């Protein structure tokens, strides 16, 4: 039987579902909104809450980062400014980790790039989520695996060959 432990909870083939509430960037760059979402997720029975961590300059070309972003839901004049507004740094992550511990919900994040993975590893996240778009990103998967933490892989759009390779 396969077993995985995240945040002290054992996840296994014949066990209960492990419910992860995807917060992503729906907190809109506001720490208090993220905390409220953590609280509601816990109240609804989630075992874990998950954010997304990106180094936008690493992921986007200079042109993409500096592209004007004229959108009613934009948090900046360029796409890069918009994306940066949504990112939490170390201080916010630490506060959210403490809050998650306080309310009894496990907190981890998706790492979209190498520096984000390193950032999360330094915070001693209990697990890493891998986005389906990175299922074939073997260098990133290998890098994250070196942290010796559980990895949850999204497989949407992937083939069984992709899943087995990952």
What are these regions (language model features)?
Residues 36-55, 123-124:
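Catalytic domains of carbohydrate-active enzymes, especially glycoside hydrolases
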Residues 45, 119-128, 146-151:
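Glycine-enriched alpha-helix->loop->beta-strand junction motifs that scaffold or abut catalytic
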